[in-house]
């Protein structure tokens, strides 16, 4: 950064948030009222300006019960008396969206589902029996494979009529109606069973069978199942069960002591391949593509067809998630006078515009290791979230930090993490996490707890004060960023797993080199890039957006660009603008 007062923007209006450490406060024990008050006073004494009430595994009072809200009310009142902020973590324990399991208990139709596929080659005349996990059959087709190994999704035999119910488990056990026979044979574990004999084909030809079912997700973290995060009705019910109940109990402090809601980890699930029964219809409506007919193109390379299908799939799933979750939660929070903050997987950076304080999950390291400032994982990219905070006029950029560093974490470790996050533009530090108790197994919940359990806690005001000053410095300065880097997210969407990994690694390596050489930059979502303007000033061509002007646009290795982005970039080039393209 340059200390040039003409270039720096003083933005004291952004300091209305209490800066410094704002820890998750894990409510993971008996939650005695006197202990709640005592721990809040401990935080206050060390300069901690606020906390996030995080119902956590191990909590001994029932979530969302009268006993629970009695304690929430006490914590809010104590914070109010001590001029501290309170944030409400919106789940028990995580990820957000299910109200401790209540959403799908009351509405099982909102259960999360995912795709399971069985793929098999079959020779002409061969009998094929395939078992797919129990669920609604979406696709059962045998595609005719030519001698050169190629095949078309338009040339197939429909196998739906060859599918029925079967079982995959045989059971032999002691059980019987009479004493004469105590041994019984049973079957279990329902499956969808396909039984088909392929017709004869020419020499060198064969069939490729795709058998795809829509399966209810099981064994999902704490809840066995999860919700359909693309279904707006499911998320509307989550808000009713969670946010509305907090409003009923402590709504009088919304916008005062209670500053907002923190949401965590929720995304379009399953994260590697989002699904919803609503998705095919929305892809058809928004993109004009029949997703079911083209499912194999999600997994295999059919050239341009795969590119179009994958883009339509990911773009639609992303928009559906934003509409179902982010937009609804943000709207509710704003209507009720509180902020919507948090961190979760980043499908594309434009989704961060809906957070009032956008966040990431990074910085879980100790001094002596190499700072992982840039990795392929968007959710850990501090520069991406700081860029979003800049472009979308957010008061801060947040990071959940200190997760799983271990009980040996020191204040030196914390300062080092804060420093490299600060370089990236992070000025709101959410510590993971302050334990109400570290008794018994609870000490193993992604430690440490940099709270009263630590031998250095008596000096914790030093690290709290440092974090506060760092945040104030960052919020009252303007970065001297001369480069604009276009997010290559849509190229990752349309690529196979290996290519996607390479593109993300290249994107991370580019950012690392820019920072290493002192070349500051912002990352911009292609959707936002389209809204910029090409201007000529002082004999130079600039790209203007958000009141800033950039001489150089950097295009990381990409495989495609959205139409609006392509034409805006082309306009900049034709006017004489500088574009640095990498491959």
Model-derived features: where do they sit?
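Acidic/aromatic-lined carbohydrate-recognition and catalytic surfaces
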Residues: 54-181, 187, 216-236
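Carbohydrate-binding surfaces of carbohydrate-active enzymes
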Residues: 4, 17-22, 26, 32-38, ...
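Aromatic- and acid-rich polysaccharide-binding/catalytic face
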Residues: 198-232, 351-372, 554
């Amino acid at each position: 950064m340059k200390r040039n007062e003409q270039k720096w923007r003083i933005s004291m209006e952004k300091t209305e948030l209490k800066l410094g450490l704002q820890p998750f406060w894990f409510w993971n024990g008996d939650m005695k009222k006197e202990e709640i008050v005592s721990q809040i006073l401990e935080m206050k004494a060390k300069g901690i300006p606020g906390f996030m009430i995080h119902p956590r595994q191990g909590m001994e009072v029932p979530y969302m019960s009268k006993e629970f809200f009695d304690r929430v009310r006490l914590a809010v009142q104590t914070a109010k008396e001590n001029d501290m902020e309170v944030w409400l973590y919106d789940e028990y324990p995580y990820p957000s969206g299910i109200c401790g399991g209540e959403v799908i208990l009351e509405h099982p139709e909102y259960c999360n589902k995912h795709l399971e596929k069985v793929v098999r080659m079959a020779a002409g005349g061969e009998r094929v029996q395939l078992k797919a996990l129990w669920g609604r059959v979406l696709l059962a087709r045998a595609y005719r494979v030519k001698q050169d190994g190629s095949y078309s999704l338009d040339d197939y035999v429909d196998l739906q009529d060859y599918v029925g119910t079967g079982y995959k488990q045989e059971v032999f056990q002691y059980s019987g109606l009479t004493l004469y026979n105590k041994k019984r044979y049973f079957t279990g574990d329902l499956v969808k069973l396909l039984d088909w004999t392929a017709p004869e084909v020419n020499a060198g030809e064969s069939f490729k069978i795709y058998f795809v079912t829509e399966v209810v997700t099981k064994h999902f973290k704490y809840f066995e199942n999860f919700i359909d995060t693309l279904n707006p009705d499911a998320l509307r019910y989550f808000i009713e069960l969670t946010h509305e109940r907090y409003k009923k109990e402590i709504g009088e402090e919304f916008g005062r002591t209670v500053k907002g809601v923190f949401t965590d980890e929720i995304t379009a699930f399953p994260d590697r391949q989002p699904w919803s029964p609503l998705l095919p219809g929305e892809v058809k409506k928004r993109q004009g593509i029949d997703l079911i007919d083209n499912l194999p193109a999600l997994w295999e390379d059919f050239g341009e067809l795969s590119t179009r299908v994958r883009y339509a799939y990911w773009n639609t799933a992303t928009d559906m998630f934003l509409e179902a979750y982010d937009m609804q939660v943000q709207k509710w929070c704003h209507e009720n006078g509180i902020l919507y903050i948090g961190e979760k997987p980043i499908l594309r950076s434009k989704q961060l515009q809906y957070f009032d304080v956008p966040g990431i999950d990074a910085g879980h390291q100790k001094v002596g290791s190499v700072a992982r400032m840039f990795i392929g994982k968007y959710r850990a990219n501090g520069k991406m979230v700081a860029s979003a905070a800049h472009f979308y006029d957010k008061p801060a950029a947040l990071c959940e930090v200190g997760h799983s560093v271990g009980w040996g974490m020191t204040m030196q470790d914390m300062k080092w993490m804060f420093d490299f996050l600060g370089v990236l533009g992070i000025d709101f530090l959410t510590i993971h996490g302050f334990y109400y108790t570290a008794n018994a197994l609870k000490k193993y919940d992604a430690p440490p707890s940099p709270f009263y359990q630590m031998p250095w806690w008596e000096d914790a005001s030093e690290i709290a004060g440092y974090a506060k000053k760092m945040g104030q410095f960052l919020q009252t300065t303007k970065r001297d960023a001369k480069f604009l880097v276009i997010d290559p997210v849509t190229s990752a969407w349309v690529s196979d797993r290996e290519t996607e990994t390479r593109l993300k690694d290249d994107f991370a390596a580019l950012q690392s080199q820019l920072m290493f050489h002192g070349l500051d930059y912002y990352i911009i979502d292609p959707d936002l890039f389209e809204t910029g303007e090409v201007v000529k000033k002082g004999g130079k061509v600039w790209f203007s957006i958000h009141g800033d002007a950039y001489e150089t646009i950097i295009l990381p290795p990409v495989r495609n660009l959205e139409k609006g982005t392509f034409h805006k970039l082309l306009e900049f080039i034709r006017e004489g603008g500088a574009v640095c393209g990498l491959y």
